[in-house]
Amino acid sequence: MMWENWTIVSEFVLVSFSALSTELQALLFLLFLTIYLVTLMGNVLIILVTIADSALQSPMYFFLRNLSFLEIGFNLVIVPKMLGTLIIQDTTISFLGCATQMYFFFFFGAAECCLLATMAYDRYVAICDPLHYPVIMGHISCAQLAAASWFSGFSVATVQTTWIFSFPFCGPNRVNHFFCDSPPVIALVCADTSVFELEALTATVLFILFPFLLILGSYVRILSTIFRMPSAEGKHQAFSTCSAHLLVVSLFYSTAILTYFRPQSSASSESKKLLSLSSTVVTPMLNPIIYSSRNKEVKAALKRLIHRTLGSQKL
């Protein structure tokens, strides 16, 4: 066979941003480190305030808390290794390390897609069927919906990662990305991957496009209900409860669809890296900022938390 004399790959090299100058990489390190810390602090703050404040115990904030946990996980999987490639040129990653990173990328990504759809359903019930909302979105139902979102991430991550790393890697080991995403890793496989690529497309449609269509359908019904409300105040109040989620969904899915539904030949590897940066680094930072700035209840809860903290320090 043509691969008999090739060396079996035991580690990979992340190309990351090695084409840039050392000075520019240092600037990117400072930028991404700042974004990373802001992301962690912002999402931890959302988690704390939705747990501690009695006014934020509704299903909407339960799901928001789950979203913040997912965003923290997403960042921990991708950003620390990327920072290492920028500041100390630590571009190598073991075979197991690459598989682990890819597994959790799939896990958090699929779980977030499903959770965003669940959050849209919560807003749909709250606005379109408010009388039955307490029954439909009870504690047990919310826990089941959240668990289903997390479990969806487990299933797709297990199937995809196990399949990819069962292929032989016996040639080049340079992954043209800043993390172990599936397309650049699959490009290094020395076997026929056509069946896997068909399955991967099916999984992408199922876990990205299908939840997006559910969200779209929910918001069509929500907007239709809002426009039929008689009072301007009622319209404003109803829309304000879902505007933050709608903005988060727009950011998340615009980059996801551009990244995974464009033909492989239509975009350069550098533009794909920029899109991936937007979805894996920038969006997780913006989510807590969006919710804390556009949601009146979250803003009020943050003010109460700050006042309590400052008051306890004075004592």
From Swiss-Prot:
Organism expressing this protein natively: Homo sapiens (Human)
GO MF term list: G protein-coupled receptor activity; olfactory receptor activity
Membrane topology (UniProt): Multi-pass membrane protein
UniProt xrefs under InterPro entries: GPCR_Rhodpsn, GPCR_Rhodpsn_7TM, Olfact_rcpt
Keyword entries, A-Z: Cell membrane, Disulfide bond, G-protein coupled receptor, Glycoprotein, Membrane, Olfaction, Receptor, Sensory transduction, Transducer, Transmembrane, Transmembrane helix
Species classification: Eukaryota, Metazoa, Chordata, Craniata, Vertebrata
Protein name: Olfactory receptor 10A4
PANTHER family: OLFACTORY RECEPTOR (PTHR26453)
Family statement drawn from the similarity comment of this UniProt entry: Belongs to the G-protein coupled receptor 1 family.
Organ and tissue specificity: Expressed in the tongue.
Record localization: Cell membrane
Disulfide bond annotation, renumbered to this chain: C98-C190
Extracellular compartment residues: 1-26, 77-100, 162-198, 260-272
Residue ranges annotated as Cytoplasmic topological domain: 48-55, 122-140, 219-238, 294-315
Taxonomy, superkingdom: Eukaryota
The protein's role, per its UniProt record: Odorant receptor (Potential). May be involved in taste perception.
Main localization (coarse): membrane
Gene Ontology BP terms: axon guidance; detection of chemical stimulus involved in sensory perception of smell
Any GO CC annotation of this UniProt entry: plasma membrane
PROSITE patterns: G_PROTEIN_RECEP_F1_1, G_PROTEIN_RECEP_F1_2
Transmembrane regions: 27-47, 56-76, 101-121, 141-161, 199-218, 239-259, 273-293
Glycan-modified residues: N5
Entries under SUPFAM superfamilies matching the protein: Family A G protein-coupled receptor-like
